[in-house]
Amino acid sequence: MNNNIFSTTTTINDDYMLFPYNDHYSSQPLLPFSPSSSINDILIHSTSNTSNNHLDHHHQFQQPSPFSHFEFAPDCALLTSFHPENNGHDDNQTIPNDNHHPSLHFPLNNTIVEQPTEPSETINLIEDSQRISTSQDPKMKKAKKPSRTDRHSKIKTAKGTRDRRMRLSLDVAKELFGLQDMLGFDKASKTVEWLLTQAKPEIIKIATTLSHHGCFSSGDESHIRPVLGSMDTSSDLCELASMWTVDDRGSNTNTTETRGNKVDGRSMRGKRKRPEPRTPILKKLSKEERAKARERAKGRTMEKMMMKMKGRSQLVKVVEEDAHDHGEIIKNNNRSQVNRSSFEMTHCEDKIEELCKNDRFAVCNEFIMNKKDHISNESYDLVNYKPNSSFPVINHHRSQGAANSIEQHQFTDLHYSFGAKPRDLMHNYQNMY
């Protein structure tokens, strides 16, 4: 711990100071310090306290005096000095100083032994330090809670912003709510609105008089003041009058909207002007014109839908016609092919029949020659034998008819064996020869 010499200018009250104490021993009262008192009194008092503590509590360490390391000057001069060369001296050696009175010198290098402290003592010290810091720093004090603001909406009037709510007297409140019950309204604002509409002619009269006379004369002002109440300047009255006169000049269709603005106290001047669009402003159309425009638009849409439907139907017809024509062409081609094949078959058959008729025995020569070998000798003898002219001729015709029937039967078998195709038949016929 650094051994420094401090000077202080604080004054201590005449009362005894009680320092924090623990449970083992009570605190000892200390004499108050004053610049006029001598240092000897302080040292005597401190030594007496330490001796008593050593006698009573030999197991505890000595508690150092709070003024053992401070040097007090009577002239209240601020001076701090430190001499490192005096660290090796004894405890009772004093440090010479030429700037102060020699009687105020006292030991500096007293060895200080740390005394163990208990938790209760540390808690008390912390609480005292917090109290001192809060008392010295006003910023550390808790800030006051802000007052509760009025969250009700306000309205702008000629005399400034006002609250929308109003406090009625007992008589006026009874009359107002009685009128509200008779009219069947659910809100008091509707009742007040009804009263304003009933009193509108009189209000307009007052407003016109205010607008014609920009500044009131003494007579006019005295006549109108009791009706409107006290206002500070004539400009407020002029503004109030202009609000009613402008509303009266407007159309009767918008009376409800303007009346609502008057009740709320919202003037036209307070509204923000919207920037004009670059495109030209279209004229307001009436209901009939808008209905006609809607009908024309519907007609145009119906025409477009019909055109689309017609186009689709035409496409379908064209596709169907193309498909029908294509099918007919395919059918005609098939028919022509069938006719050609049938014609060729008939033509070939005719040719074959003609050839067979002309060269019937030549076509089936081998077959006939083979069949002749199987004919009985009797029939052959009958054909060749001619004892009588009539009998052999008959037999010859019979044998010839039998041969013809056999040839025809075999020809039909040959025809069916070759198949139905005439080309194959002609090919086989050519190969035979």
Swiss-Prot record:
Tissues expressed in: Expressed in unelongated axillary buds, and, to a lower extent, in axillary structures such as flowers and siliques.
The encoding gene: TCP18
Localization annotation: Nucleus
Any matching Pfam family: TCP
Keywords for this protein: Developmental protein, DNA-binding, Nucleus, Transcription, Transcription regulation
Ranges where the record places region Disordered: 130-163, 247-281
Induction details: Induced during environmentally induced bud dormancy (planting density). Repressed transiently after shoot apical meristem (SAM) decapitation (release from apical dominance).
Function: Transcription factor that prevents axillary bud outgrowth and delays early axillary bud development. Indirectly required for the auxin-induced control of apical dominance.
Domain R: from-to ranges: 287-304
Gene Ontology cellular-component annotations: nucleus
A single GO BP: regulation of secondary shoot formation
Protein name in UniProt: Transcription factor TCP18
Organism: Arabidopsis thaliana (Mouse-ear cress)
GO molecular function annotation: DNA-binding transcription factor activity; transcription cis-regulatory region binding
Reported phenotype of the disruption mutant: Increased shoot branching but reduced response to strigolactone (e.g. GR24). The triple mutant brc1 brc2 abcb19 is insensitive to GR24 treatment but is partially restored with regard to shoot branching.
